[in-house]
Amino acid sequence: MSKVIGIDLGTTNSCVAIMEGKDVRVIENSEGARTTPSMVAFSESNERLVGQSAKRQAVTNPTNTLYAVKRLIGRRYDDPTVEKDKGLVSYNIVRGDNGDAWVESRGQRYAPSQISSFVLTKMKETAEAYLGEAVTQAVITVPAYFNDAQRQATKDAGKIAGLEVLRIINEPTAAALAYGMDKKQGGTIAVYDLGGGTFDISILELGDGVFEVKSTNGDTFLGGEDFDQRVIDYLAEEFKREQGIDLRKDKLALQRLKEAAEKAKIELSSSKETEINLPFITADASGPKHLVMKLTRAKLESLVDDLVERTLGPCRAALKDAGVTAGEIDEVILVGGMTRMPKVIETVKTFFGKEPARNVNPDEVVAIGAAIQGAVLKGDVKDVLLLDVTPLSLGIETLGGVFTRLIDRNTTIPTKKSQTFSTADDNQTAVTIKVYQGEREMAADNKLLGNFDLTGIPPAPRGVPQIEVTFDIDANGIVSVSAKDKATGKEQQIRIQASGGLSDTDIERMVKDAEANAAADKAKRELVDARNHADGLVHQTEKTLKDNEGKVSAQDKGEAEAAIAAVRSALEGSDLEAIKSATERLTQVAMRIGEAMYKAQAEAGAAQPGAETAAPGDKVVDAEFEDVDDKKKSA
């Protein structure tokens, strides 16, 4: 039975884990790291780079290095947060054919789900390399405050990567699962999750293997990227004040600033001061310019103070929805790389009135929880029940543009709810059902998830037809909506797909692209391996001929030189079969030369005087020896 992997698909970094027996193992990638940068780049030759290899070349290839794409997933191009993001990233954000926010690199447009699928493929390959077998099933985590469109887009990314996504699980819930798995006592816990791009807070009740989410809240556009941006802006402003040059207008300089800002932020979690040194950051008529600046922890904290403070609003809302006070929280778990920042730890400690738990790795705990959930779904782990909630209210637009809720936020999922509505006009034969998600009273102020028509309603006075609208939320938090005319039994149903979203055709095309790329990558790897093998064989054969000049027959030497020339000729092209064929021919010639040399050596050895074996009857004399240890003699 194939294994189910747990993947934390993060904004900045991703992580993959697997359940082995009773233990969970976080799997190291090919570079030996336990987390992988969620970055994808396209080189000049259009080679796709993922993870650390993409991050390494980001400074020299800023417009084609895609990072923090998770912030765009499931969002419309005209979303205000997308507009804000356009001014912060070094790559191009463009409008997709469906109106969603897509990204562009080297003239090619990609859906955020597609870019995320490249990262998921890397995590899948990491697990396969460790397990030595194919992996087809996964549990993938998302921020708890992700809406339906973002969840669906994440599931699509898994499908494009060739994974059957058994469950989409909320990141704080996964962290709680990892934390509470071995805990005997129950209690109320708060999971404070501040990652690279998003913030979540969840309140959970733990007890007897039941993990029940009481409430969740958050901000899907608040995380480490915003903290980095504050440092970037500060450094750029200081440099502009001193040199009169705005580094943010130079994409190469901006990428170097971004790397330096992230490094400085991390260093200031353990030290009080750090130096940022970027030689030759730019140049003007007077010559090259260098950026050398000191940044203290106190200055960093003053730059990001309001961002840390912003996390407390959702915390208050989550406590209120759960019906508990901060003092009633038994344990606070910190998740996400940003929670290593002393200012964040201090703020959480002050708000909840207790020291946060330090016995979980904030970078790995989410992937560990996802792996545990995978084992639960497979039946390998028993007596664990996860009860999650929907983060936002769901409803439809009714007369006057009002948002009528059918399912309130923090309702335990899976869930199903129906309500009967009627027509607004006399003789109305069709109704349009507009589905929204959010907390505002007017529908237009909330997120439109999708709409559909129910037609064929018999003409009747307004208010007479009975139209039953049913919302169904599955365990992944993904919504289906149906509308049924009770008189005729006619029904219309849709799986919500954002206002745009990827169609099944789009997903199928992207799956095929991914498969084609996998085949192309395999072919490229085979060609490189064949070239390396051929080069090595040519070098070895030439060395053999040179070292054994005079010992190889003229015929064999001629054949070897002809075979070497054939290999070199094949290496000038890219025909894999031609290289293999020429290499095979050279291998045969080299083996024959080797055999001839060994044979000649054996014959020469046999002919040498003193090499004969003792004839029968010859006197054999035992040698006398001394045992060094025992100082005994024997004859």
Curated annotation (Swiss-Prot):
Pfam families recorded: HSP70
PANTHER family, A to Z: HEAT SHOCK PROTEIN 70KDA
Name under which the protein is recorded: Chaperone protein DnaK
Molecular function terms, GO-annotated: ATP binding; ATP-dependent protein folding chaperone; unfolded protein binding
Stretches for region Disordered: 601-635
Induction per the UniProt record: By stress conditions e.g. heat shock.
Modified residues (Phosphothreonine): 198
CDD domains: ASKHA_NBD_HSP70_HSPA9
Keywords attached to this entry: ATP-binding, Chaperone, Nucleotide-binding, Phosphoprotein, Stress response
SUPFAM superfamilies assigned to the protein according to its UniProt record, in alphabetical order: Actin-like ATPase domain (SSF53067), Heat shock protein 70kD (HSP70), C-terminal subdomain (SSF100934), Heat shock protein 70kD (HSP70), peptide-binding domain (SSF100920)
Gene: dnaK
Family designation: Belongs to the heat shock protein 70 family.
Chain intervals with Low complexity compositional bias: 601-616
Purpose of the protein: Acts as a chaperone.
